[in-house]
Amino acid sequence: DLEFLARYTNAHWLVRRAPGTADDGLFVRGRDGKPLAYDRNTDQIVDAARTDISPAMRGCFPLHEAAPGDGGSDGEAVPAFQLLLDRYLDERYSPDAVAGQTGIDADRIRRIAAELAHAAFEQEISLDVEWTDWAGRKHDKIIGRPVSMHAMRGISAHSNGFQTCRAIHLLQMLLGSIDCPGGFRYKPPFPRPAPPGPKPAGKPHQVS
C-alpha cells in the first residue's frame, strides 16, 4: 500500500549512499535538520513532511546541488523503501531459498503470501466516513485492510524474536493494515486500539 507508506511512514525519506564516509546510511536532511524526499511532481529534493508532494518510493538520486542546505558529503540517495526492496527481494529470501530453514514448504509460503495480498487489496473495506488525518488532509472515506496479526511474549521470548516481531509489523505496514478497519483482532489483550475496544475475553464476569 504505497499511499499508506507515504502518508504514515518514513519509507520515502532519502538515505545517503556514500560508502567510506561518516554519512553513509544516514537520512539526508536539510539545513533545518528535517528529512528530505524526492518529489516526482517537480523532480526536486524537498522536505519529506510536505503534504503536497508525490514522493518517490524507488530510485536513486544524485545529491550534489540537489539537497538544499544539506551539509553532508556528495553522493547519491535512495528512498528507505528502496533499501527494503533490495533486501526483501534478494534471492536469499525467496520461498525456495528459505523453505529448508523455516521448515515450511515453498508452495505454502507462496500461498499464504497470495492470501494476505488478496485479503488486503481485493477485499478492502471502504467506509463512507469523512475524516481528517494527522497532516490536516481531509478524506471522504476510510479504507480498511482485513488482515490482522498479533505478536506478544510468545515470539519476543525466543532468540531473535525481536526481529520476528519487526518483520510482522513491517508486513502490516506494507499491507497498510495498521490502525484501520480490519487491522485489529477482536478483543486482543495488546496492542490496544485507540479508542479502546471491547475487553478481552477471560473469566466469565469479564466477558461482555
What are these model-derived regions, one by one?
Residues 1-131, 136:
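Long, well-ordered, tryptophan-enriched scaffold segments
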Residues 2, 157-160, 175-182:
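Short helix-capping/linker segments at secondary-structure and domain boundaries
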Residues 64, 169-208:
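Extended redox/cofactor-interaction regions of prokaryotic respiratory oxidoreductases
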Residues 81, 109, 146, 164-168:
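Short runs of predominantly hydrophobic/aromatic residues within well-ordered alpha helices
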Residues 98-104, 132-134, 152-158, 188-195:
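Conserved short loop/turn motifs at secondary-structure junctions
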Residues 127-150, 158:
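Long, compositionally biased
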Residues 128, 161-167, 183-187:
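Composition- and surface-driven signal marking solvent-exposed, interaction-prone regions
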Residues 151-166, 170-173:
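Conserved phosphate/anionic-ligand binding catalytic regions in large, soluble enzymes, centered on
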